[in-house]
Each structure stands twice: as C-alpha cells, then as structure tokens.
Amino acid sequence: MGSVKSSNPALEGLHEELGVMEEQIRSIIESFIELGVSVYDFPGTPEASQGMVTNLKRNVDRIFKLNQTSNDPQSALKDVNVPLEVVQYIEDGRNPDIYTREFVEAIRRSNQYQRAKMHGMGMLRDSLAEKIKEQFPELKDDVENIVQRTNMKPTGQARVNSGTTNMTTTAEQSNVVNATAGDVGTNANTTESVEQNGI
C-alpha cells in the first residue's frame, strides 16, 4: 500500500496538468470558431478589423503558451506520448476512446491466445511424457527432468502484473515449452532408431 500512496502525488500532478491542458485546447478551439464566424460576417469596418486582430493575437498567444507548457522539462506531460493512431482518430472525427478500447481488447485476445497455446503445449508435453515413459522406461529420468524444467507455474506476482507483462511472460513460457517439447521428440526418435537397429 505504501508504494501506491507514494505514486499518487505524481499521478495527481499529471491529471491536474492534463486538465489545464484540456482547458487551454478547448479555449483555443472556441476562439478559432469565433474567429471563423467573425471572418464570415466581417463588415469591413475599422472596429471589426481591430477586433479580429485582437482575437487573432489572443489565439496566437494561447498557442504559444500551450507550446511552452508541452515543452517544459519540469512538466509531467513531457513523458506523455500520444499515439499517432489517436491523432488519426481525432482527424477522422472518431472518438479516441475507441482506440483505447480496441487496444485493450487486442491485448486481451493476444494474452488469451498465448495462454491457451501454453496450456495446450503443457497438455501435449504431459501426454507425450506419459507415453514415452510407458514405451521407453529407460528414459523415465530424462523425461521427468524435462517435465520438471518446463513446468513453469505463474507466481502470485505474475498474476497481479498488467496484461502486457502477463502476455510477455506467457509468450516466454510458450517458447520454453516448444523448445523442450522438441527435446522430448528428439529423445523419442533416437530411442526408436536405436531399437530398430537392434542396439
């Protein structure tokens, strides 16, 4: 609980700066809308020209301030990277929250696929190990050694990790299972070849 509390101030500062940035961007958008209306209904009078120049300068100042805030090395926003796909969603008039939802769903599907693959390889390993021990008792120690080395159970720490880390761990486990399953197949083929040659 202590680590969570220590990270709260940074998160609160980030959310606060994001809120300020959101207000600045909203003000800039509203000002440009007002500027567009002024240009459309521009009467051509000196007063209207002065008001348009003032509005334009205000927009430039707001954009300049926004740029300064985004490039401030002391700002918590300096490490925030917006994916180009999100920008494209906004340009296309789509809700950027859809990108987040689709990304999370893609990670979840990939994680489930890797877990199912690991589980399937584990079942294949156990079944193959039992058959090899039945047919070739002299390989029992080697088979049990391989099964023990590839019997990687997720720890409690792995369960509380994020989906991306969990997916990476699962992929690594799957690779180990694939490699060791190949070892079992090689040992079985070697033994079968030896028996066929009468050695």
UniProtKB/Swiss-Prot annotation:
Pfam families: Med10. It is found in: Nucleus. Its main location: nucleus. It comes from the Eukaryota. GO terms for biological process: negative regulation of transcription by RNA polymerase II; positive regulation of transcription elongation by RNA polymerase II; positive regulation of transcription initiation by RNA polymerase II; RNA polymerase II preinitiation complex assembly. Keywords: Activator, Nucleus, Transcription, Transcription regulation. GO terms for cellular component: core mediator complex; mediator complex. GO terms for molecular function: transcription coregulator activity. Component of the Mediator complex, a coactivator involved in the regulated transcription of nearly all RNA polymerase II-dependent genes. Mediator functions as a bridge to convey information from gene-specific regulatory proteins to the basal RNA polymerase II transcription machinery. Mediator is recruited to promoters by direct interactions with regulatory proteins and serves as a scaffold for the assembly of a functional preinitiation complex with RNA polymerase II and the general transcription factors. Belongs to the Mediator complex subunit 10 family. Component of the Mediator complex. This is Mediator of RNA polymerase II transcription subunit 10. It comes from Candida glabrata (strain ATCC 2001 / BCRC 20586 / JCM 3761 / NBRC 0622 / NRRL Y-65 / CBS 138).
